[in-house]
Amino acid sequence: DEEPKETCSDDMCVIYCKGEEFSTGACDGPQKCKCS
């Protein structure tokens, strides 16, 4: 299981904000992405 990354170019990746799945709105904390 790979750690979420700071950036990701794949549209299929899930964005995580503060460790939670995040898809819309403004993220006011650390944002990372994870590719399956």
Curated annotation (Swiss-Prot):
Intrachain disulfide bonds: 8-27, 13-33, 17-35
Primary location class: secreted
Pfam families, alphabetized: Toxin_31 (PF08119)
Tagged with keyword Secreted: yes
One Gene Ontology cellular component annotation held by this UniProt entry: extracellular region
Keyword Disulfide bond assigned: yes
GO BP of this protein: envenomation resulting in negative regulation of voltage-gated potassium channel activity in another organism
Tissues of expression: Expressed by the venom gland.
Protein family membership: Belongs to the short scorpion toxin superfamily. Potassium channel inhibitor family. Alpha-KTx 11 subfamily.
Name under which the protein is recorded: Potassium channel toxin alpha-KTx 11.3
Species in which this protein is naturally found: Parabuthus granulatus (Granulated thick-tailed scorpion)
Lineage: Eukaryota, Metazoa, Ecdysozoa, Arthropoda, Chelicerata
